[in-house]
C-alpha cells in the first residue's frame, strides 16, 4: 500500500475542477515572493511526447558542463518531490513542505492551481539553491502554462506536438 501523500494537506485545498490556463495569478504571486524566477535563467521544453526525456537530457548536459542546474517536470509518479530536482538531487520532503507551508495565504489570495503552487515552490527552491539554469518542462500548452512566467528563457525547445489537448489550447 502506498504511503500517504505528505503534501495533501498543503496542495488539496487548491485543487479545482477543469483547466484554468493563464499567467496573471502566478505572476502576481511571484511578485509577492520577490520574483525568485528572476534569479536564474531557464530553458523551457514544450510538446506532446518526449518533453520529459528532452528536459532530463538537457539537465544532464548542463550539469556535466559544470552549470548549477535545476529541473522541473510533471507529472510525478509517487511524490511531488520528483518534480523538482536541485543541483544536489531531488528536493526533500521537509524542504518542499516548508516552501508550500509558507504559501497558503498567497495561494488563496491569487487563487493558484496546484500546478501554479508547485511551480512557485520550484522557483523559490531554485533561487535558494543558487541555480544558474533551470530546465522547465511545460505542463499544458506553453503560451499560458505556469512555466512561461519565467522571464529569461533564451532557449525554448519543442518535442513532437499532437492534437491531444486541442479542446483546451485551440
In which residue ranges do the predicted regions lie?
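ATP-dependent carboxylate-amine ligase catalytic core
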Residues: 6, 18, 23-38, 64-154, ...
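Charged, amphipathic alpha-helical linker segments immediately N-terminal to NTP-binding catalytic cores
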Residues: 1-17
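A short, structure-level motif marking secondary-structure boundaries and short turns
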Residues: 12, 42-44, 107-108
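A conserved segment at the C-terminal end of the G1
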Residues: 41-45, 53-70
Amino acid at each position: 500500500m502506498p504511503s500517504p501523500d505528505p503534501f495533501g494537506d498543503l496542495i488539496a485545498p487548491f485543487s479545482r475542477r477543469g483547466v484554468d490556463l493563464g499567467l496573471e495569478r502566478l505572476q502576481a504571486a511571484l511578485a509577492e515572493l520577490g520574483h525568485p524566477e528572476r534569479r536564474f535563467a531557464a530553458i523551457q521544453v514544450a510538446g506532446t511526447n518526449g518533453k520529459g526525456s528532452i528536459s532530463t537530457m538537457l539537465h544532464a548536459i548542463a550539469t556535466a558542463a559544470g552549470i548549477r542546474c535545476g529541473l522541473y517536470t510533471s507529472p510525478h509518479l509517487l511524490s511531488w518531490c520528483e518534480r523538482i530536482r536541485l543541483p544536489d538531487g531531488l528536493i526533500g520532503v521537509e524542504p518542499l513542505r516548508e516552501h508550500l507551508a509558507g504559501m497558503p495565504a498567497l495561494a488563496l489570495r491569487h487563487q493558484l492551481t496546484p500546478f501554479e503552487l508547485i511551480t512557485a515552490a520550484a522557483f523559490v527552491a531554485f533561487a535558494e539553491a543558487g541555480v544558474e539554469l533551470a530546465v522547465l518542462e511545460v505542463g499544458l500548452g506553453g503560451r499560458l502554462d505556469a512555466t512561461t512566467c519565467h522571464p529569461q528563457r533564451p532557449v525554448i525547445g519543442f518535442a513532437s506536438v499532437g492534437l491531444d489537448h486541442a479542446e483546451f489550447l485551440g
